[in-house]
Amino acid sequence: MAEEASGTSSSVVALPQKVTLYSYHLSSCAWRVRLALLFKGIPYEYKAVDLLRGEQFTDEFTKLNPLQMVPVLAIDGVTLVDSIGILLYLEERFPDKRPLLPKDLVQRAQIHQVVSLISAYIQPLQMGGILATIEAKFGKEEQLKWIQDIFRKGFSALEQILIRTAGKYCFGDTITLADIVLVPQFANAIRLQVDLAPYPTIQRVGEALNELPEVKSSVPANQPDAPKL
Ligand SMILES: N[C@@H](CCC(=O)N[C@@H](CS)C(=O)NCC(=O)O)C(=O)O
C-alpha cells in the first residue's frame, strides 16, 4: 500500500457538531459505518433500530430512509443513507483523518472492486429477509446450500484478488475501505459456518483485522442494543 494512505490524524478539519448513527447491532452494513467512524475518530450517538421488531418500517424511520434499511447517518445537517455512500462521504469529508483510500488511482479502483464484490454481491444475497424466504419455501437445508454457494463464489473471487494485494490487511499493511467491508462479512462467514479452509488469505487478513481495537469495540456484542448476557 502506498505511504499516502498511512497518514495519522493530522487534520485540522473541525469535527462535526453532532453525528447520529441509526444502527442495529447485527447489521453488517451498519457495522461498516461504525468502523469508519471509529477509525476516523468521529464521536457519534448510537440510535438503535430494532430490525427484528420491524422498527425500520415505522413512518418515522421511513422518512429518514425510504428504503427502510440501516445504516442511516445524520451528519453536517444532512441525512445520509447506504453504507457505501456514507463511507465515501466520511472519506472525502475527512480525507486526512486516518485515510481509508490511497491516492493511487489503480489501487483505489482495486479497493472499490473489493468493496463492490462484498457489498453488491455477497451481502445482498444473504440478507435476513432473503434467507427467511428461502427457508420458508425450501427448508433449512436449501437455505444453508444457498449461503454456501454465495460464499463459495464470492470468497473464491476475493481470495484471488487478495493473494495479489494483501499484506497484513487487504491492501498492504494499511487499513482501507476494503478492510472495513471485509470485517463484518468475515464475521458473518464464521457465524454461518462457512468452511474458510479454501480461503487462507481471507482467513489470515480477517483474523488480523479482528485484533484491532476499533474492530473489537465495533462488534455486535459491544453495541448498546445487543442483548445483555
Ligand atoms: N446497500 C445498503 C444495504 C443496507 C442493508 O441491507 N441493510 C440491512 C441490514 S444489513 C437492513 O436494514 N435490512 C432491513 C430489512 O431487511 O428489513 C447499504 O449498504 O447500506
Locations of the language-model features?
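GST-like domain detector, emphasizing the conserved glutathione-binding G-site
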Residues: A2-K145, D149
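GST-like fold's C-terminal all-alpha helical module
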Residues: V106, V114, I118-E211, S217
